Protein backbone atom coordinates (compact mmCIF):
# COMPACT_ATOMS: atom_id res chain seq x y z
CA UNK A 1 0.00 0.00 0.00
CA UNK A 2 2.77 2.40 0.96
CA UNK A 3 4.56 1.60 -2.30
CA UNK A 4 1.43 2.45 -4.32
CA UNK A 5 1.13 5.80 -2.53
CA UNK A 6 4.77 6.56 -3.26
CA UNK A 7 4.27 5.76 -6.95
CA UNK A 8 1.15 7.91 -7.06
CA UNK A 9 2.98 10.77 -5.40
CA UNK A 10 5.88 10.37 -7.79
CA UNK A 11 3.46 10.53 -10.76
CA UNK A 12 1.90 13.70 -9.43
CA UNK A 13 5.33 15.21 -8.94
CA UNK A 14 6.35 14.51 -12.53
CA UNK A 15 3.04 15.90 -13.78
CA UNK A 16 3.49 19.02 -11.66
CA UNK A 17 7.02 19.63 -12.96
CA UNK A 18 5.90 19.09 -16.56
CA UNK A 19 2.96 21.48 -16.21
CA UNK A 20 5.19 24.17 -14.66
CA UNK A 21 7.71 23.78 -17.48
CA UNK A 22 4.89 24.18 -20.01
CA UNK A 23 3.67 27.30 -18.20
CA UNK A 24 7.16 28.76 -18.09
CA UNK A 25 7.68 28.11 -21.81
CA UNK A 26 4.33 29.67 -22.78
CA UNK A 27 4.91 32.62 -20.45
CA UNK A 28 8.42 33.17 -21.76
CA UNK A 29 7.30 33.19 -25.39
CA UNK A 30 4.49 35.63 -24.61
CA UNK A 31 6.92 37.95 -22.82
CA UNK A 32 9.16 37.92 -25.90
CA UNK A 33 6.24 39.06 -28.09
CA UNK A 34 6.02 42.24 -25.99
CA UNK A 35 9.55 43.13 -27.04
CA UNK A 36 9.14 42.11 -30.67
CA UNK A 37 7.99 45.59 -31.68
CA UNK A 38 11.18 47.14 -30.29
CA UNK A 39 13.55 44.97 -32.33
CA UNK A 40 14.25 45.82 -35.96
CA UNK A 41 13.49 42.56 -37.86
CA UNK A 42 16.19 43.42 -40.39
CA UNK A 43 18.65 42.59 -37.61
CA UNK A 44 16.76 39.74 -35.89
CA UNK A 45 13.92 38.55 -38.10
CA UNK A 46 12.75 35.80 -35.73
CA UNK A 47 11.25 38.38 -33.35
CA UNK A 48 8.75 39.36 -36.02
CA UNK A 49 7.41 35.80 -36.17
CA UNK A 50 6.84 35.80 -32.42
CA UNK A 51 4.93 39.07 -32.73
CA UNK A 52 2.50 37.27 -35.04
CA UNK A 53 1.83 34.79 -32.24
CA UNK A 54 0.71 37.35 -29.66
CA UNK A 55 -2.98 36.39 -29.83
CA UNK A 56 -2.48 32.58 -29.83
CA UNK A 57 0.09 32.79 -27.03
CA UNK A 58 -2.20 35.02 -24.98
CA UNK A 59 -4.99 32.46 -25.36
CA UNK A 60 -2.67 29.60 -24.38
CA UNK A 61 -1.59 31.45 -21.23
CA UNK A 62 -5.20 32.28 -20.38
CA UNK A 63 -6.18 28.59 -20.65
CA UNK A 64 -3.20 27.61 -18.47
CA UNK A 65 -4.17 30.26 -15.92
CA UNK A 66 -7.75 28.99 -15.67
CA UNK A 67 -6.52 25.40 -15.48
CA UNK A 68 -4.10 26.24 -12.65
CA UNK A 69 -6.77 28.16 -10.72
CA UNK A 70 -9.19 25.24 -11.06
CA UNK A 71 -6.53 22.89 -9.67
CA UNK A 72 -5.75 25.35 -6.85
CA UNK A 73 -2.14 25.32 -8.02
CA UNK A 74 0.19 28.10 -6.93
CA UNK A 75 1.66 27.93 -10.42
CA UNK A 76 -1.22 30.16 -11.59
CA UNK A 77 1.16 33.04 -10.86
CA UNK A 78 3.27 32.16 -13.92
CA UNK A 79 0.64 32.74 -16.64
CA UNK A 80 -0.91 35.55 -14.61
CA UNK A 81 2.31 37.57 -14.57
CA UNK A 82 2.85 36.87 -18.27
CA UNK A 83 -0.65 38.07 -19.13
CA UNK A 84 -0.59 41.32 -17.16
CA UNK A 85 1.35 43.34 -19.79
CA UNK A 86 -1.08 42.13 -22.48
CA UNK A 87 -3.71 44.42 -20.95
CA UNK A 88 -1.80 47.31 -22.55
CA UNK A 89 -1.82 45.69 -26.02
CA UNK A 90 -5.00 43.64 -26.40
CA UNK A 91 -6.93 46.80 -27.31
CA UNK A 92 -5.02 46.86 -30.60
CA UNK A 93 -6.86 43.67 -31.59
CA UNK A 94 -10.28 43.91 -29.96
CA UNK A 95 -12.33 46.76 -28.48
CA UNK A 96 -15.32 46.44 -26.16
CA UNK A 97 -18.44 48.00 -27.71
CA UNK A 98 -19.09 51.39 -26.14
CA UNK A 99 -21.88 53.93 -26.04
CA UNK A 100 -22.45 56.33 -28.91
CA UNK A 101 -19.36 58.50 -29.53
CA UNK A 102 -19.20 62.08 -28.37
CA UNK A 103 -20.52 64.28 -31.20
CA UNK A 104 -17.85 66.13 -33.14
CA UNK A 105 -17.44 69.80 -32.25
CA UNK A 106 -15.06 70.48 -35.14
CA UNK A 107 -15.17 69.64 -38.88
CA UNK A 108 -14.69 65.98 -39.77
CA UNK A 109 -12.87 64.02 -42.43
CA UNK A 110 -13.84 60.54 -43.66
CA UNK A 111 -11.12 58.20 -44.92
CA UNK A 112 -11.36 54.77 -46.55
CA UNK A 113 -8.28 52.54 -46.87
CA UNK A 114 -8.73 49.35 -48.86
CA UNK A 115 -6.43 46.72 -50.35
CA UNK A 116 -8.59 45.67 -53.29
CA UNK A 117 -6.51 42.60 -54.16
CA UNK A 118 -6.18 43.53 -57.86
CA UNK A 119 -9.96 43.03 -58.14
CA UNK A 120 -9.32 39.28 -58.39
CA UNK A 121 -11.39 37.97 -55.48
CA UNK A 122 -14.46 37.07 -57.53
CA UNK A 123 -12.30 35.12 -59.97
CA UNK A 124 -10.92 33.01 -57.14
CA UNK A 125 -14.11 32.51 -55.15
CA UNK A 126 -16.98 32.64 -57.65
CA UNK A 127 -16.22 31.11 -61.06
CA UNK A 128 -17.79 33.12 -63.84
CA UNK A 129 -17.58 36.47 -62.06
CA UNK A 130 -14.60 38.53 -63.22
CA UNK A 131 -12.48 41.51 -62.30
CA UNK A 132 -14.94 44.02 -63.73
CA UNK A 133 -17.75 42.81 -61.48
CA UNK A 134 -15.43 42.82 -58.48
CA UNK A 135 -14.22 46.36 -59.24
CA UNK A 136 -17.77 47.63 -59.74
CA UNK A 137 -18.80 46.13 -56.38
CA UNK A 138 -15.84 47.72 -54.61
CA UNK A 139 -16.40 51.18 -56.06
CA UNK A 140 -20.14 50.97 -55.32
CA UNK A 141 -19.25 50.30 -51.69
CA UNK A 142 -16.75 53.17 -51.60
CA UNK A 143 -19.30 55.59 -53.08
CA UNK A 144 -21.81 54.52 -50.43
CA UNK A 145 -19.32 55.57 -47.73
CA UNK A 146 -19.18 59.12 -49.18
CA UNK A 147 -15.53 59.54 -48.14
CA UNK A 148 -13.33 62.60 -48.45
CA UNK A 149 -10.19 60.54 -49.10
CA UNK A 150 -9.75 57.01 -50.46
CA UNK A 151 -6.48 55.06 -50.28
CA UNK A 152 -6.36 51.96 -52.49
CA UNK A 153 -3.62 49.35 -52.57
CA UNK A 154 -3.20 46.61 -55.21
CA UNK A 155 -5.34 48.57 -57.65
CA UNK A 156 -5.17 46.93 -61.09
CA UNK A 157 -6.21 48.06 -64.54
CA UNK A 158 -5.93 46.20 -67.84
CA UNK A 159 -4.86 49.30 -69.82
CA UNK A 160 -2.46 51.67 -68.11
CA UNK A 161 -3.40 54.47 -70.53
CA UNK A 162 -7.00 54.53 -69.30
CA UNK A 163 -6.43 54.95 -65.56
CA UNK A 164 -7.71 58.51 -65.19
CA UNK A 165 -10.74 58.07 -67.42
CA UNK A 166 -11.67 54.85 -65.63
CA UNK A 167 -11.38 56.43 -62.18
CA UNK A 168 -13.32 59.52 -63.28
CA UNK A 169 -16.13 57.23 -64.36
CA UNK A 170 -16.15 55.28 -61.11
CA UNK A 171 -15.61 58.20 -58.71
CA UNK A 172 -17.08 61.39 -60.16
CA UNK A 173 -15.98 64.52 -58.33
CA UNK A 174 -12.77 62.90 -57.05
CA UNK A 175 -9.27 63.58 -58.32
CA UNK A 176 -6.91 60.61 -58.53
CA UNK A 177 -3.19 60.46 -57.78
CA UNK A 178 -1.42 57.17 -58.35
CA UNK A 179 1.72 55.25 -59.12
CA UNK A 180 1.37 51.96 -60.99
CA UNK A 181 3.86 49.28 -61.96
CA UNK A 182 3.42 48.09 -65.57
CA UNK A 183 2.96 44.37 -66.16
CA UNK A 184 3.08 42.30 -69.38
CA UNK A 185 0.15 42.86 -71.71
CA UNK A 186 -0.27 46.56 -70.97
CA UNK A 187 -1.89 46.16 -67.55
CA UNK A 188 -0.60 47.78 -64.35
CA UNK A 189 -1.06 47.72 -60.58
CA UNK A 190 -0.14 49.87 -57.60
CA UNK A 191 -1.46 52.51 -55.21
CA UNK A 192 -4.22 55.03 -55.89
CA UNK A 193 -5.36 57.93 -53.70
CA UNK A 194 -8.66 59.64 -54.51
CA UNK A 195 -9.98 62.82 -52.93
CA UNK A 196 -12.43 65.66 -53.47
CA UNK A 197 -10.24 68.02 -51.42
CA UNK A 198 -7.90 70.60 -53.00
CA UNK A 199 -4.53 68.98 -53.75
CA UNK A 200 -1.47 70.97 -52.64
CA UNK A 201 1.41 68.58 -53.25
CA UNK A 202 2.18 64.95 -54.03
CA UNK A 203 5.02 62.46 -54.25
CA UNK A 204 6.04 58.82 -54.09
CA UNK A 205 8.44 56.68 -52.08
CA UNK A 206 9.71 53.71 -54.08
CA UNK A 207 11.22 50.74 -52.30
CA UNK A 208 14.35 48.99 -53.50
CA UNK A 209 13.83 45.66 -55.31
CA UNK A 210 10.11 45.69 -54.63
CA UNK A 211 6.79 46.13 -56.39
CA UNK A 212 5.47 47.82 -53.24
CA UNK A 213 5.57 51.54 -52.53
CA UNK A 214 4.04 54.49 -50.70
CA UNK A 215 2.54 57.58 -52.29
CA UNK A 216 1.69 60.77 -50.44
CA UNK A 217 -0.67 63.64 -51.12
CA UNK A 218 -1.06 66.98 -49.34
CA UNK A 219 -4.55 68.41 -48.92
CA UNK A 220 -6.23 71.36 -47.29
CA UNK A 221 -9.56 71.09 -45.48
CA UNK A 222 -11.29 73.63 -43.24
CA UNK A 223 -8.17 75.78 -43.17
CA UNK A 224 -5.88 72.92 -42.15
CA UNK A 225 -3.22 71.40 -44.34
CA UNK A 226 -2.11 67.80 -43.87
CA UNK A 227 -0.45 64.90 -45.67
CA UNK A 228 -1.86 61.42 -46.34
CA UNK A 229 0.55 58.52 -46.85
CA UNK A 230 -0.93 55.60 -48.78
CA UNK A 231 1.36 52.66 -48.01
CA UNK A 232 1.68 49.09 -49.18
CA UNK A 233 4.60 47.37 -47.49
CA UNK A 234 6.20 44.06 -48.45
CA UNK A 235 3.88 41.06 -48.21
CA UNK A 236 4.77 37.45 -47.39
CA UNK A 237 3.74 36.25 -50.88
CA UNK A 238 2.85 32.81 -49.56
CA UNK A 239 -0.06 30.60 -50.53
CA UNK A 240 -1.98 28.85 -47.75
CA UNK A 241 -3.42 26.27 -50.18
CA UNK A 242 0.12 25.64 -51.44
CA UNK A 243 1.38 25.07 -47.90
CA UNK A 244 -1.46 22.64 -47.20
CA UNK A 245 -0.71 20.73 -50.40
CA UNK A 246 2.95 20.52 -49.41
CA UNK A 247 1.93 19.27 -45.96
CA UNK A 248 -0.19 16.46 -47.37
CA UNK A 249 2.49 15.50 -49.88
CA UNK A 250 5.29 15.78 -47.30
CA UNK A 251 7.11 18.08 -49.74
CA UNK A 252 9.94 19.71 -47.82
CA UNK A 253 10.76 22.08 -50.67
CA UNK A 254 7.43 23.88 -50.12
CA UNK A 255 8.33 24.66 -46.53
CA UNK A 256 11.87 25.68 -47.45
CA UNK A 257 10.54 28.07 -50.09
CA UNK A 258 7.90 29.44 -47.70
CA UNK A 259 10.54 30.07 -45.04
CA UNK A 260 12.74 31.92 -47.54
CA UNK A 261 9.83 34.11 -48.66
CA UNK A 262 8.89 34.97 -45.08
CA UNK A 263 12.46 35.87 -44.16
CA UNK A 264 12.83 38.03 -47.28
CA UNK A 265 9.58 39.86 -46.52
CA UNK A 266 10.34 40.31 -42.82
CA UNK A 267 13.79 41.78 -43.49
CA UNK A 268 12.65 44.07 -46.33
CA UNK A 269 9.61 45.56 -44.60
CA UNK A 270 11.42 47.46 -41.80
CA UNK A 271 13.64 49.15 -44.38
CA UNK A 272 10.53 50.30 -46.24
CA UNK A 273 8.93 51.49 -43.00
CA UNK A 274 12.08 53.43 -42.12
CA UNK A 275 11.97 55.14 -45.53
CA UNK A 276 8.41 56.31 -44.93
CA UNK A 277 9.16 57.30 -41.34
CA UNK A 278 12.14 59.37 -42.49
CA UNK A 279 9.88 61.20 -44.95
CA UNK A 280 7.29 61.78 -42.21
CA UNK A 281 9.96 63.26 -39.96
CA UNK A 282 10.88 65.82 -42.61
CA UNK A 283 7.26 66.59 -43.53
CA UNK A 284 6.30 70.20 -42.66
CA UNK A 285 2.63 69.32 -42.00
CA UNK A 286 0.82 66.75 -39.87
CA UNK A 287 0.47 63.32 -41.43
CA UNK A 288 -2.02 60.49 -41.69
CA UNK A 289 -0.54 57.06 -42.42
CA UNK A 290 -2.92 54.64 -44.13
CA UNK A 291 -2.71 51.38 -45.96
CA UNK A 292 -1.74 47.73 -45.88
CA UNK A 293 1.25 47.38 -43.56
CA UNK A 294 1.33 43.56 -43.91
CA UNK A 295 2.25 43.57 -40.24
CA UNK A 296 0.44 43.16 -36.94
CA UNK A 297 0.00 45.62 -34.05
CA UNK A 298 2.85 43.99 -32.09
CA UNK A 299 5.33 44.70 -34.87
CA UNK A 300 8.22 47.07 -35.40
CA UNK A 301 6.32 48.54 -38.39
CA UNK A 302 3.30 49.51 -36.31
CA UNK A 303 5.36 50.77 -33.37
CA UNK A 304 7.54 52.93 -35.62
CA UNK A 305 4.72 54.53 -37.60
CA UNK A 306 2.59 55.13 -34.50
CA UNK A 307 5.06 57.72 -33.17
CA UNK A 308 3.16 60.98 -32.94
CA UNK A 309 -0.03 59.29 -34.11
CA UNK A 310 -3.11 57.46 -32.86
CA UNK A 311 -4.80 54.33 -34.18
CA UNK A 312 -8.37 54.93 -35.37
CA UNK A 313 -9.41 51.43 -34.27
CA UNK A 314 -7.99 51.78 -30.76
CA UNK A 315 -9.72 55.14 -30.36
CA UNK A 316 -13.09 54.43 -31.97
CA UNK A 317 -13.35 50.76 -32.99
CA UNK A 318 -15.65 48.06 -31.66
CA UNK A 319 -15.26 44.28 -31.59
CA UNK A 320 -12.44 42.58 -33.49
CA UNK A 321 -10.29 44.80 -35.68
CA UNK A 322 -8.94 42.05 -37.98
CA UNK A 323 -8.70 43.09 -41.63
CA UNK A 324 -7.35 39.98 -43.38
CA UNK A 325 -10.44 37.99 -44.30
CA UNK A 326 -8.97 34.53 -44.63
CA UNK A 327 -7.51 34.32 -41.13
CA UNK A 328 -10.15 36.35 -39.33
CA UNK A 329 -10.02 37.33 -36.46
CA UNK A 330 -6.27 36.80 -36.06
CA UNK A 331 -4.67 39.26 -38.49
CA UNK A 332 -5.06 43.01 -38.35
CA UNK A 333 -2.70 44.43 -40.97
CA UNK A 334 -4.56 47.43 -42.48
CA UNK A 335 -4.61 50.76 -40.64
CA UNK A 336 -5.58 54.40 -40.51
CA UNK A 337 -3.20 56.28 -38.20
CA UNK A 338 -4.01 59.90 -37.43
CA UNK A 339 -2.09 62.83 -35.92
CA UNK A 340 -2.21 63.00 -32.12
CA UNK A 341 -4.22 66.21 -31.96
CA UNK A 342 -7.02 64.85 -34.15
CA UNK A 343 -9.70 62.47 -32.86
CA UNK A 344 -11.23 59.37 -34.41
CA UNK A 345 -14.95 59.38 -33.70
CA UNK A 346 -15.93 56.38 -35.83
CA UNK A 347 -14.08 53.30 -37.07
CA UNK A 348 -15.55 50.44 -39.05
CA UNK A 349 -14.20 47.33 -40.78
CA UNK A 350 -17.12 46.12 -42.92
CA UNK A 351 -16.88 42.40 -43.60
CA UNK A 352 -17.59 42.57 -47.31
CA UNK A 353 -16.12 39.82 -49.46
CA UNK A 354 -14.76 41.69 -52.46
CA UNK A 355 -11.09 41.16 -51.57
CA UNK A 356 -8.96 39.06 -49.26
CA UNK A 357 -8.79 42.22 -47.13
CA UNK A 358 -11.62 44.09 -45.45
CA UNK A 359 -11.78 47.88 -45.91
CA UNK A 360 -11.02 50.27 -43.07
CA UNK A 361 -13.33 53.27 -42.73
CA UNK A 362 -12.70 56.06 -40.22
CA UNK A 363 -14.26 59.43 -39.46
CA UNK A 364 -11.79 61.91 -38.00
CA UNK A 365 -12.50 65.12 -36.12
CA UNK A 366 -9.97 67.75 -37.19
Describe each region flagged by the PLM.
Residues 33, 80-108, 139, 149-241, ...:
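Structured beta-strand-rich core segments of catalytic domains in phosphoester-bond hydrolases
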